[in-house]
């Protein structure tokens, strides 16, 4: 099993959720996060004063899935989150050792939606 974690611009969240549903995902977790990559934050002006915003708002989506579904999930996210501008984000695919559905006690493949 895999955990696909994507961090991207908040404005792309609805498009990513729709793309994941179309790719067969029926479960995900969404978190609001902050961070920076190559863009190193940005400078904003408020009431004539410049302020450096180092940590930019992003959205993190986590999808637990089968090994076979991981690439399909990642491609769906890329298609929906890509604006071809700096700061579009990153996708991390990690191995999951165990998944347990709390309600039923189901484990691993039976406990994930994809």
Show which residues each predicted segment covers.
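Positively charged, small/polar-rich N-terminal and surface patches that mediate targeting and assembly
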Residues: 1-114
């Amino acid at each position: 099993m895999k955990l696909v974690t994507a961090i991207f611009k908040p404005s792309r969240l609805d498009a990513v959720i729709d793309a994941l549903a179309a790719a067969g995902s029926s479960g995900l977790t969404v978190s609001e996060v902050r961070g920076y990559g190559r863009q190193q934050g940005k400078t904003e002006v408020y009431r004539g004063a410049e302020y450096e915003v180092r940590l930019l708002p992003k959205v993190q989506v986590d999808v637990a899935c089968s090994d076979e579904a991981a690439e399909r999930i990642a491609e769906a996210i890329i298609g929906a989150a890509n604006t071809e501008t700096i700061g579009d984000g990153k996708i991390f695919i990690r191995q999951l050792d165990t998944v347990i559905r709390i309600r039923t006690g189901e484990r691993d493949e039976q406990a994930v939606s994809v």
